[in-house]
Amino acid sequence: MSSEDRHLGSSCGSFIKTEPSSPSSGIDALSHHSPSGSSDASGGFGIALSTHANGLDSPPMFAGAGLGGNPCRKSYEDCTSGIMEDSAIKCEYMLNAIPKRLCLVCGDIASGYHYGVASCEACKAFFKRTIQGNIEYNCPATNECEITKRRRKSCQACRFMKCLKVGMLKEGVRLDRVRGGRQKYKRRLDSENSPYLNLPISPPAKKPLTKIVSNLLGVEQDKLYAMPPNDIPEGDIKALTTLCELADRELVFLINWAKHIPGFPSLTLGDQMSLLQSAWMEILILGIVYRSLPYDDKLAYAEDYIMDEEHSRLVGLLDLYRAILQLVRRYKKLKVEKEEFMILKALALANSDSMYIENLEAVQKLQDLLHEALQDYELSQRHEEPRRAGKLLLTLPLLRQTAAKAVQHFYSVKLQGKVPMHKLFLEMLEAKV
């Protein structure tokens, strides 16, 4: 991986590895006076932020996200009321402004989310052409070419590999949209004289569940990579550094993900923050659990960072390993599907134990919507198990207990000053304790 691809922005005082990175969050700025003594940050993700005593700036996910002259910027007092003044994240950090996203492939300005990833029109078209044409590329060098806005055309092989690495989905490309593809497909069916061609086809009835699950699946991370630092010796410091950096990047993605939950954006800004601050660790742990399902007695913190019991013991994470593994075994026994995990993540957010809810009725309405979505999904997909929705909901208390253990563990790491922690992860951690 080149230094250019690893660097998140010239305006940031420090950086972590982001290739591949989670999609941008749509958050404007981070500003909070930390109990641990951090200075107030007044810039956006694209502006260098002041750091904690043991803290680093969270990665800048956007270009041109500065707050100067931004009509959407509000003062902390204007945005929050009473109880939220002590919140670990100021409301201007959330959804007031939509700065420019960066293409995760080449760093150009992203035009939106294409095939599951924030990307520019050029990389979107390149990926589509490659998949539809079933094109194979060969790198003339060592398969490690830098892919930037200026050099993205220099090596198609490395550009395509980076598309896949940051999470672009091959399945998202419609093969029948190749020029002339639909006509060819139709002629082929006609030639087969299938007896079913003349039967009327009625589209399946669309329920609210379909929209909810589609929204959640559409913004779900496909692959997550930790990319452990090579300059730190193996041991507890390397493991903790890797996991803290990973959590910080996941949090940026998580906040963007939450905006796509039907009903969540309509909550007050204060309630959005309260739910996120309360449930973020539960959501991250559900991600670990889902990635760990294919393995036996191992935890997949990321695609390239998998720990067994012995590794966990050596780096001081044995208690956390056992707690999360208990959840993995429970979900394995239930044979939980991806769609169910997506709904459970949303439910974990909505069922937060936060005491700082401003509009309880609106939050309860969101809870009811998601409970109904889970029940509808089970009725339509697992109708042979009438009690399945209830069994899944009964896993949430254990999830909350496990998340509490994880928060306490990493907060103790923070107090010991063992490893540097990026600003977003650190502030969410402090808000939870």
Swiss-Prot record:
GO biological processes: cell dedifferentiation; cell population proliferation; embryonic placenta development; in utero embryonic development; inner ear development; morula formation; negative regulation of DNA-templated transcription; negative regulation of stem cell differentiation
Region (Interaction with NANOG): 93-211
Keyword Phosphoprotein: no
Site annotation Important for stabilizing DNA-binding: residues: 185
Zinc finger map (NR C4-type): 103-123, 139-163
UniProt entry keywords in alphabetical sequence: Acetylation, Chromosome, Cytoplasm, DNA-binding, Metal-binding, Nucleus, Receptor, Transcription, Transcription regulation, Zinc, Zinc-finger
Quaternary state and interactors: Binds DNA as a monomer. Interacts with NR0B1; represses ESRRB activity at the GATA6 promoter. Interacts with NANOG; reciprocally modulates their transcriptional activities and activates POU5F1 expression. Interacts with NCOA3; mediates the interaction between ESRRB and RNA polymerase II complexes and allows NCOA3 corecruitment to ESRRB, KLF4, NANOG, and SOX2 enhancer regions to trigger ESRRB-dependent gene activation involved in self-renewal and pluripotency. Interacts with KDM1A; co-occupes the core set of ESRRB targets including ELF5 and EOMES.
Name of the gene this protein is made from: Esrrb
Domain NR LBD, chain residue ranges per copy: 208-432
Residue ranges the UniProt entry marks as DNA-binding: 100-186
Source domain of life: Eukaryota
UniProt GO cellular component terms: condensed chromosome; cytoplasm; nucleus
Listed InterPro entries: Est_rcpt/est-rel_rcp, NHR-like_dom_sf, Nucl_hrmn_rcpt_lig-bd, Nuclear_hormone_rcpt_NR3, Nuclear_hrmn_rcpt, Oest-rel_rcp, Znf_hrmn_rcpt, Znf_NHR/GATA
Protein name from the UniProt record: Steroid hormone receptor ERR2
Chloroplast as UniProt keyword: no
UniProt note: phenotype after gene disruption: Homozygote Esrrb mutant embryos die at 10.5 dpc. They have severely impaired placental formation. The mutants display abnormal chorion development associated with an overabundance of trophoblast giant cells and a severe deficiency of diploid trophoblast. Conditional knockdown mice exhibit head bobbing and spinning and running in circles and have hearing impairment.
